[in-house]
């Protein structure tokens, strides 16, 4: 029986908090209609109209080795793929359903190939697994808030046995935990209304998961969702507590602490465009420059960032996504020390020009916008500054002695040189080493 132990928990979370940056991948049958992963619910598509997509799912361009290489090149340390999303279709070979990838033209277990590809690149393996299942006959249909058949009285729930569904859920999660070696992250999704906690058989489920995968990290969505924080926040963890909070499509304004004011582990998940699953008409991509800054913001507040890619119907990353990943990777190549293993810079105020992260006695000043005149290092004890260097190439950045800041004798200023345009106009990083 699993019981929360603070020391074991903190040890389990070490690699994850050091990693700071991961990739989410949403891929499934919904990639064929290409109108987002919730298409069946949003458009209330009947089962008989959705099932034919199985005949088209051939995974022709599925190349998890390429996925892994792009994630690694972008500076990501872990990847989470949807083994099953809410439509109930499985990318793995489950013995408990025929609604699976081995019964499509793809004809093979895609999760097996995925985990092998990640391990070859030294990436941590994450599996997303939904708690919902719009395909299963015992999952509530009519009257459920989000089921595709929610408005169809003929799909009533009189003969549905939810205990059969939770047994099915348990069995499939057991397959995931048994058949694919070490799983580093299980990303459950999601609780809503009264569908939370023990409604899912959560204690039994987590006891099984933690017995088979004792070091696995689990999100908080057995008891919460993109909103809500779970029992760790209440300082009274249930057996199925989340290891991290999972804010969705938002970065917390001030990071996240529990009720007693202790920092919590969290991960902001968001999309590159406006959909998780492939959407052919959604070309509203966030620029790489924005996402680089958001990564720095997450780390400066004590969180991780997991950035989504939605492969197309054939399994290929959209060209826009690949270009964004490559651009982020160029920045990470030079500046990863300001991300990996970093934490908030306590007692240092957020500067007007950017963000600050810290690793030990080294502070990383992320400059998004240059200042007029020398750049102030507010909150730094100027007598304890050992040196200041540009992180990208290591050159010395001198402490300024200019006359224009003589009215501020207690504040350290640095001289970035005569050019008002930053060497990196997106996020130019200084490494400030302080005396220990």
Which residues make up each language-model segment?
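Mature catalytic domains of secreted/periplasmic carbohydrate-active enzymes
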Residues: 1-436
